[in-house]
Amino acid sequence: MKTVLITGGTRGIGKAVAQEFLQQGYEVILNYFHDEEAALATQSEFNMQGYCPVLMRADVSDEEQVKDMFKEVFRIYGKVDVLVNNAGISKIQVIQDTSVYDWEEVFDVNVKGVFLCSREVAESMIFSGGGCIINVASIWGEVGASCEVAYSASKGAVIAFTKALAKELAPSFVRVNCVSPGVIDTEMNSHLSEVEMEDLINQIPLGRLGTGEDVAKACLFFAENSYVTGEVLSVGGGFSK
């Protein structure tokens, strides 16, 4: 049975990705950090469906915590077949109000976290003859978003990281790809007013918000297709502004 570790896997997009992989018969490890109550509730919800995902608490921006998490995962499962780097944070603010702390906090989770988790899993994947790393970026990393400079820049970095690492690991049959969600109906977009949300929907050719399931199916495609690497798949309903 294949194993997938999903960072930020107990809510939003990560939870939807977990659901998709559980339904496909994967052993699923759900990483979380801040909200243990929500993590346990998600685990319980999956248990009621007959699934048994494992929770792993770790701050993906903390090198030692990431190392400890993967040591425990390797102890239990031996390897990780698929890593989904989904954990991320955003800050809504104009650049004049963005402190160095704000900037570094976003980059620590969104970029450093992807680096640390990918680094820890790479050697195992190489020695086991292959694997798959899927990074969750954002359409804002491709086109930019006003008042989200730090977030947009961090997701642009994730896209560049994906393309570079894909070339580096391809000779070892480790595939690295990126899913780039558009406007998805999750808690991360709850700050948007009804008018702002309507304006965004009007810019989406398919005329609706995306769902976590839409993103999850893209992740599963990358996990299951052995001849795709270095790609960025936009899941945004045609939004490209």
Say what each PLM segment does:
Residues 123, 167-171:
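Alpha-helical segment proximal to the catalytic Tyr-Lys
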Residues 138:
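Residue(s) in the substrate-gating loop at a strand-loop-helix junction
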Residues 118, 154, 162:
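Active-site helix of classical SDR
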Residues 130, 208-235, 240:
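C-terminal substrate-recognition "lid" of short-chain dehydrogenase/reductases
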